[in-house]
């Protein structure tokens, strides 16, 4: 049993890739590429390393780097061109802007002509934008904050800046902004020194505001009602324990004078029978 376990561990360690290998693309991993033109199976091909090569490897590959159909360039020159113009690539029929400027600097004796005549119809004329700002203009630019006043804040600001006034002018200046929308608030009149408030007729609404003044006829009525509900036991209602019902008030209030005397006699008899 131990030998089987040791053999399994040994096989796993031997199959593990101890030497760093190059990465393969997802399309090439664990499958073969089928060439449709020749109808033949091709073996796996390793892709180039993802990590950029070291300077020592650069020197070895400078002699081997060749582009089919073009002249031989060294990797150092290609990196230098890529550093100058990182976002432009040379296509057939189009020359990068860095190569055009370099050619003009090397041959200044040639007559300068328009780039459209030198290049093909697909040539895009490069444009230079200078983002550098002169120091004088940079000093003039300053930050100015922008404030936006709301309607109620603007009204408060105008009221604060205006000189102190009294009377109707001060009331007109401090009117809120919702009066413009059609809502007219009722103006509260000051209390008279005599202690009585005079009812004022509102000219806008056409109605007079309600007052709390009570007439002499209404006030005793409320006093009587309050006196009837008041109890001497502090709000505790105790019903009467007498079994004899009081029928005097009932007959006097509900009996119609048009009832005949016979009906009155019958009611009197029934009342006498009910009494113990």
Swiss-Prot record:
Post-translational modification, as annotated: O-glycosylated.
Biological processes annotated in GO: biomineral tissue development; odontogenesis of dentin-containing tooth
Major place of residence: secreted
Pfam families: ODAM
PANTHER family per UniProt: ODONTOGENIC AMELOBLAST-ASSOCIATED PROTEIN
Complex formation: Interacts (via C-terminus) with ARHGEF5.
Name of the protein in its database record: Odontogenic ameloblast-associated protein
């Amino acid at each position: 049993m131990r030998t089987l376990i040791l053999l399994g561990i040994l096989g796993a360690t031997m199959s593990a890739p101890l030497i760093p290998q190059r990465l393969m693309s997802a399309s090439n991993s664990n499958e073969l590429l089928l060439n449709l033109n020749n109808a033949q199976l091709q073996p796996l091909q390793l892709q180039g390393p993802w990590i950029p090569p070291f300077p020592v490897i650069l020197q070895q590959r400078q002699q081997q780097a060749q582009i089919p159909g073009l002249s031989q360039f060294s990797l150092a020159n290609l990196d230098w061109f890529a550093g100058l113009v990182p976002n432009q690539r040379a296509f057939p029929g189009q020359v990068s802007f860095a190569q055009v400027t370099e050619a003009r600097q090397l041959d200044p004796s040639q007559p300068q002509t328009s780039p459209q005549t030198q290049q093909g119809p697909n040539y895009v004329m490069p444009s230079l934008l200078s983002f550098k700002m002169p120091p004088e203009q940079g000093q003039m630019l300053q930050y100015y904050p922008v404030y936006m006043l709301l309607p109620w804040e603007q009204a408060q600001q105008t009221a604060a800046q205006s000189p102190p006034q009294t009377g109707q002018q001060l009331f007109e200046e401090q009117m809120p902004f919702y009066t413009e929308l059609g809502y007219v608030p009722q103006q509260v009149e000051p209390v008279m020194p005599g202690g009585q408030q005079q009812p004022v007729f509102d000219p806008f609404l056409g109605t007079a505001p309600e007052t709390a003044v009570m007439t002499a006829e209404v006030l005793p009525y409320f006093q009587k009602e309050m006196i009837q509900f008041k109890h001497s036991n502090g709000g505790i209602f105790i019903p009467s324990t007498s079994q004899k019902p009081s029928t005097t008030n009932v007959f006097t209030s509900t009996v119609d004078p048009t009832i005949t005397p016979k009906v009155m006699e019958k009611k009197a008899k029934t009342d006498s029978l009910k009494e113990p």
